[in-house]
Amino acid sequence: MTDREQFFRDVNKIVIKIGTSSITRKGCDHTKENCNIDPAFMESIAAQVYELRKHGKEVILVSSGAIGVGLNELGIAPKPREIPIRQAAAAVGQSILMQDWSRAFSKYGMKVAQILLTYEFYSDRVTYLNLRNSISTLLEYEVVPIINENDCTCTNEIEAIFGDNDKLSAMVASKIDADLLIILSDIDGLFDRNPKTHSDAKLLTLIKKITPEIESYGGDPTNFKGVGGMRTKIKAAKICSMAGCYVVIANSEIEDVVTKILSGEEIGTLFLAERHIQKNRARWIILARASGTVRVDAGAKAAVLGKNSLLPAGIVDIEGTFDRGDVVKLECEGKVFAKGITNYTSKELIKIKGAQTNQIDNILGYNNYDNVIKKENIGILEGIN
């Protein structure tokens, strides 16, 4: 077994970030931004995702390209600096992008879902919780989430905050506890110097730790179409490393590149992760300060310990005042056995405790979630039998 096979053996949740230069890579002038989509490339990605899904892997895509596609559709000259024009292009291009992704995945009987994000998604707790729950639910229904920055509503942030979605993909990967982020672009990986100007540049296949020297290898954007150069990719890898997520930067032109990466082939640059430090999201939940206590019966405790979500039917009592998105203790017969992030406020739980899931709407007048705490948002305390 190769080193990479060993690293990727337990990889289950994968984020694949696809750059603008990959989506439009064939028959396009690289000095321009407005280019047509490459349907063959999209179908190749869909085929590889399909194979991963057959092996039980969960896959999320982060897809760039909306602005470039929109500019081409509207017949606008490349690289306009006016934000309203770029926003309009993003709105037009995003719909085309999703239609083509849907068409590509439909050939393999798969459905896709569009998720557009702004900077707020990782700075606001409730928005972040909504994102996690939405992606988790889509994956449960075997839908492929396709994420992009919401360029249409950004102002000065447009293409600047996330850097052609490099940072966005890293933030998504870290927030949903992904095991691996694959960044596909038109470059082979990280070199010790610029390969365009140095014929003896060496491809670095393994980065164990991102040091100042490694960061110095990041340069300017690789072309005029995307805005994400190697510097932003190194920053993305740094974010993922701290979250316990591996990162591979590879060239999208390699045939079946995703499949080959997961099979252990030494393609591109692999950034190792501090998996022993922060991989377990449950550890953060366990160490977080609880805002209240949810008391449950023995049946609910057994369900939670069996890695199931907490439902309102098993709740006996509520203690404290807390909001949606807060961490709460789970207690049974006087003993705290877990902590979790609640989907409902303390006032709401007082009303729906002991109720069946199908009764929530009648009691509250709405039903935001069938579960009180999703299984992914529960941390079991050590020593619980």
From Swiss-Prot:
Q: What is its main location?
A: cytoplasm
SUPFAM superfamilies registered for this protein in UniProt = Carbamate kinase-like (SSF53633), PUA domain-like (SSF88697)
Write out the residues that bind substrate: S64, D151, N165
Give the UniProt subcellular location, in the record's own words: Cytoplasm
Broad enzyme group: transferase
State the UniProt keywords alphabetically: Amino-acid biosynthesis, ATP-binding, Cytoplasm, Kinase, Nucleotide-binding, Proline biosynthesis, Transferase
Which terms does the UniProt entry file under GO BP? L-proline biosynthetic process; proline biosynthetic process
Residues of the PUA domain: 291-367
**What does the sequence similarity comment in the record state about its family?**
Belongs to the glutamate 5-kinase family.
This molecule's function is given as: Catalyzes the transfer of a phosphate group to glutamate to form L-glutamate 5-phosphate.
Report what the protein is called.
Glutamate 5-kinase
